[in-house]
Amino acid sequence: IFCEAYPTFSTRADFDCFYALKEVRFYLDSWQLTPACQLLDHIEMLNWADNKFYYQEWLLLHCKLQLRSGQANHAHTYELVRFALKITRSDIDNAAIHSLFLSSVEIELFIYLAQEALYLGDTATAHHVCQQISSYLSARSLSFLERDRLLAENAVVYTKYLLTVCDYQSALELSDLYRHQM
Protein backbone atom coordinates (compact mmCIF):
# COMPACT_ATOMS: atom_id res chain seq x y z
CA ILE A 1 0.00 0.00 0.00
CA PHE A 2 1.34 3.40 -0.99
CA CYS A 3 0.60 6.39 1.21
CA GLU A 4 1.43 9.93 0.29
CA ALA A 5 2.01 12.41 3.08
CA TYR A 6 0.31 15.77 2.96
CA PRO A 7 1.28 18.65 5.23
CA THR A 8 -1.16 19.97 7.77
CA PHE A 9 -1.26 23.55 8.96
CA SER A 10 -2.27 24.94 12.32
CA THR A 11 -3.28 28.37 11.00
CA ARG A 12 -3.88 30.20 7.76
CA ALA A 13 -0.60 32.08 8.26
CA ASP A 14 1.17 28.73 8.55
CA PHE A 15 -0.22 27.67 5.17
CA ASP A 16 0.49 31.08 3.60
CA CYS A 17 4.14 30.93 4.70
CA PHE A 18 4.57 27.37 3.48
CA TYR A 19 3.08 28.19 0.09
CA ALA A 20 4.94 31.49 -0.24
CA LEU A 21 8.28 29.77 0.46
CA LYS A 22 7.56 27.35 -2.40
CA GLU A 23 6.70 30.29 -4.65
CA VAL A 24 9.92 32.10 -3.72
CA ARG A 25 11.91 29.02 -4.73
CA PHE A 26 10.10 28.98 -8.07
CA TYR A 27 10.79 32.67 -8.68
CA LEU A 28 14.45 32.38 -7.69
CA ASP A 29 14.94 29.35 -9.92
CA SER A 30 13.35 31.37 -12.75
CA TRP A 31 15.53 34.41 -11.97
CA GLN A 32 12.43 36.50 -11.25
CA LEU A 33 13.98 38.42 -8.40
CA THR A 34 11.38 41.16 -7.86
CA PRO A 35 8.45 38.83 -7.07
CA ALA A 36 10.79 36.68 -4.96
CA CYS A 37 11.78 39.74 -2.93
CA GLN A 38 8.15 40.80 -2.52
CA LEU A 39 7.16 37.36 -1.27
CA LEU A 40 10.08 37.25 1.16
CA ASP A 41 8.89 40.60 2.55
CA HIS A 42 5.36 39.20 2.84
CA ILE A 43 6.61 36.13 4.73
CA GLU A 44 8.55 38.39 7.09
CA MET A 45 5.38 40.44 7.73
CA LEU A 46 3.65 37.18 8.67
CA ASN A 47 6.46 36.67 11.20
CA TRP A 48 7.27 33.32 9.55
CA ALA A 49 4.08 31.96 11.16
CA ASP A 50 6.13 31.68 14.37
CA ASN A 51 7.86 28.66 12.82
CA LYS A 52 11.65 28.39 13.18
CA PHE A 53 11.87 26.06 10.18
CA TYR A 54 10.14 28.62 7.95
CA TYR A 55 12.49 31.27 9.32
CA GLN A 56 15.49 29.08 8.55
CA GLU A 57 14.32 28.48 4.97
CA TRP A 58 13.51 32.19 4.62
CA LEU A 59 17.11 33.03 5.59
CA LEU A 60 18.41 30.57 2.98
CA LEU A 61 16.19 32.05 0.28
CA HIS A 62 17.13 35.57 1.34
CA CYS A 63 20.82 34.63 0.89
CA LYS A 64 20.06 33.17 -2.54
CA LEU A 65 18.26 36.37 -3.52
CA GLN A 66 21.20 38.50 -2.38
CA LEU A 67 23.64 36.35 -4.34
CA ARG A 68 21.55 36.30 -7.51
CA SER A 69 20.91 40.03 -7.40
CA GLY A 70 24.62 40.77 -7.12
CA GLN A 71 24.08 42.54 -3.79
CA ALA A 72 25.72 39.94 -1.57
CA ASN A 73 28.27 40.91 1.03
CA HIS A 74 30.02 37.56 1.35
CA ALA A 75 31.22 38.04 4.94
CA HIS A 76 27.69 39.00 6.03
CA THR A 77 26.13 36.15 4.02
CA TYR A 78 28.57 33.65 5.55
CA GLU A 79 27.56 34.74 9.05
CA LEU A 80 23.87 34.73 8.09
CA VAL A 81 24.16 31.13 6.83
CA ARG A 82 25.92 30.11 10.06
CA PHE A 83 23.14 31.80 12.03
CA ALA A 84 20.50 29.96 9.99
CA LEU A 85 22.21 26.64 10.68
CA LYS A 86 22.31 27.42 14.40
CA ILE A 87 18.52 27.65 14.44
CA THR A 88 18.39 23.85 14.32
CA ARG A 89 22.06 22.96 14.99
CA SER A 90 23.34 24.84 18.03
CA ASP A 91 26.82 23.37 17.64
CA ILE A 92 27.88 23.48 14.00
CA ASP A 93 30.70 21.08 13.22
CA ASN A 94 31.70 20.96 9.57
CA ALA A 95 33.80 17.88 10.27
CA ALA A 96 30.84 15.80 11.41
CA ILE A 97 28.27 16.48 8.70
CA HIS A 98 28.19 12.80 7.78
CA SER A 99 26.96 11.85 11.26
CA LEU A 100 24.03 14.26 11.32
CA PHE A 101 20.45 13.80 10.19
CA LEU A 102 19.91 16.88 8.03
CA SER A 103 16.87 18.40 6.39
CA SER A 104 17.13 19.44 2.75
CA VAL A 105 17.21 23.09 3.88
CA GLU A 106 20.14 22.35 6.20
CA ILE A 107 21.96 20.59 3.36
CA GLU A 108 21.43 23.64 1.15
CA LEU A 109 22.69 25.87 3.95
CA PHE A 110 25.87 23.80 4.23
CA ILE A 111 26.33 24.08 0.45
CA TYR A 112 25.92 27.86 0.69
CA LEU A 113 28.32 27.90 3.64
CA ALA A 114 30.92 26.22 1.43
CA GLN A 115 30.26 28.68 -1.37
CA GLU A 116 30.58 31.73 0.87
CA ALA A 117 33.75 30.28 2.44
CA LEU A 118 35.15 29.95 -1.07
CA TYR A 119 34.25 33.56 -1.90
CA LEU A 120 36.01 34.63 1.31
CA GLY A 121 39.15 32.72 0.30
CA ASP A 122 38.73 29.80 2.71
CA THR A 123 39.26 27.05 0.14
CA ALA A 124 39.97 24.41 2.80
CA THR A 125 36.52 24.83 4.37
CA ALA A 126 34.82 24.92 0.97
CA HIS A 127 36.59 21.73 -0.11
CA HIS A 128 35.88 19.92 3.14
CA VAL A 129 32.17 20.85 3.28
CA CYS A 130 31.61 19.95 -0.39
CA GLN A 131 33.21 16.54 0.12
CA GLN A 132 31.17 15.96 3.28
CA ILE A 133 27.91 16.90 1.52
CA SER A 134 28.69 14.71 -1.48
CA SER A 135 29.34 11.65 0.67
CA TYR A 136 26.35 12.50 2.89
CA LEU A 137 23.97 12.65 -0.08
CA SER A 138 25.32 9.40 -1.49
CA ALA A 139 24.54 7.58 1.76
CA ARG A 140 21.09 9.02 2.53
CA SER A 141 17.63 8.19 1.31
CA LEU A 142 16.13 11.10 -0.56
CA SER A 143 13.92 11.30 -3.58
CA PHE A 144 15.92 11.00 -6.79
CA LEU A 145 14.98 14.52 -7.86
CA GLU A 146 15.91 16.04 -4.52
CA ARG A 147 19.22 14.19 -4.30
CA ASP A 148 20.13 15.07 -7.90
CA ARG A 149 19.26 18.73 -7.33
CA LEU A 150 21.34 18.91 -4.16
CA LEU A 151 24.24 17.01 -5.73
CA ALA A 152 24.15 19.40 -8.68
CA GLU A 153 24.14 22.45 -6.39
CA ASN A 154 27.05 20.98 -4.47
CA ALA A 155 28.84 20.24 -7.76
CA VAL A 156 28.52 23.89 -8.80
CA VAL A 157 30.29 24.99 -5.62
CA TYR A 158 32.88 22.22 -5.89
CA THR A 159 33.53 23.17 -9.52
CA LYS A 160 34.16 26.76 -8.39
CA TYR A 161 36.59 25.35 -5.84
CA LEU A 162 38.38 23.31 -8.52
CA LEU A 163 38.65 26.39 -10.73
CA THR A 164 40.05 28.35 -7.79
CA VAL A 165 42.80 25.77 -7.25
CA CYS A 166 43.42 25.61 -11.03
CA ASP A 167 42.33 21.98 -11.46
CA TYR A 168 40.64 22.72 -14.77
CA GLN A 169 40.39 19.15 -16.02
CA SER A 170 38.56 17.95 -12.91
CA ALA A 171 36.33 21.04 -13.03
CA LEU A 172 35.40 20.27 -16.64
CA GLU A 173 34.63 16.63 -15.86
CA LEU A 174 32.52 17.48 -12.81
CA SER A 175 30.58 20.25 -14.51
CA ASP A 176 29.93 18.04 -17.52
CA LEU A 177 28.61 15.29 -15.25
CA TYR A 178 26.05 17.55 -13.54
CA ARG A 179 25.23 20.19 -16.16
CA HIS A 180 21.81 18.74 -17.06
CA GLN A 181 20.62 18.22 -13.49
CA MET A 182 19.91 21.79 -12.42
Give the label of every model feature segment.
Residues 1-14:
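Basic, Lys/Arg-rich alpha-helical nucleic-acid-recognition elements, primarily the DNA-binding modules
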Residues 144-149, 169-173:
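Short acidic alpha-helical/loop segments enriched in Asp/Glu that coordinate divalent cations
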Residues 19-31, 59-72, 105-122, 150-166:
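Tandem amphipathic alpha-helical repeat scaffolds
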